[in-house]
C-alpha cells in the first residue's frame, strides 16, 4: 500500500499459502526474520520451510506461519485452484454455487468449469457466483455462451457406456464478481455479461488492460509487457476504461481476515433471485 506494507489480495486454493491458512487481508511483515520481499523472500527455498510473520488485524501482534514454497506450473496451479474453489454456500433460501476462475490461459480451464457444473459440486446449485477477480486473463468471448439459455446442451453416450455433455449451458441465475484485478480477456467477458444482461456484475471497476501483449525478459529479473495489437470490443475501447459493475461494492482488503463483502453481496442477490 502507500505506506510500503505488503498485503495478501488473493489466495489460490490448493497452493501452499492456502494450505497453511494465509487469508486475504493479511499483512506480511517478515520472512525468516527479514523484511518481506515478494518473490525474493522465497527465491532458492523451494521445499524448505519459510517462517512468515503475519499481522491479521491493525495494531495486533504478528503471528507466525510456516510455509514451504513450491515449484508450480502456472496453468496447473490455476486449474487446481479452479477445481478446489468450487463449493456450495447454503442459505435459508437457496444453495449458491461458487467458483473462482483465476485464469483462462488454457482451454482446459473452460472444460473443467463445464465439468464442475455437470458432474461436480456445482451441479445441484440453485444459482452461481462466477468469480473473475484477480489472476490472469486469456478468456475468449465465446466462453460466455456457457450462460446462453437459448442454446441446447447435448448428452452423448459412447458404445462403452461412458456419458458426456457437449455445449454445456447454465440455465440458472448467475452473478459475476469483478475488481481492479480483473483484466485482459476477463474484461471482455465482463463487458458481454453486462451488455447482454446475463446477470448482476458485482464488485469494482475492472483494470482496463485489454490490449494484446507480448512478454520480454529485461535481463534484470524484470518482465516487460509490450502491447502488440489494438483491441476493440463491439467497436468500443475498454483499454484504460474498464468495465463498471451493475452493483458497486467497495472492498478494502487490508486486515479483512478472510472476509469478502463482494461475495457476501452476490450471495445475498442470488438468494433472492
Language-model segments: what does each one mean?
Residues 28-29, 50, 238:
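Generic structural signal for buried aliphatic residues
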Residues 110, 187-188, 236-242, 259:
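Short conserved micro-motifs at the rims of enzyme active sites and ligand-binding pockets
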Residues 215-240, 245-246:
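C-terminal structured "cap/appendage" subdomains that terminate the fold
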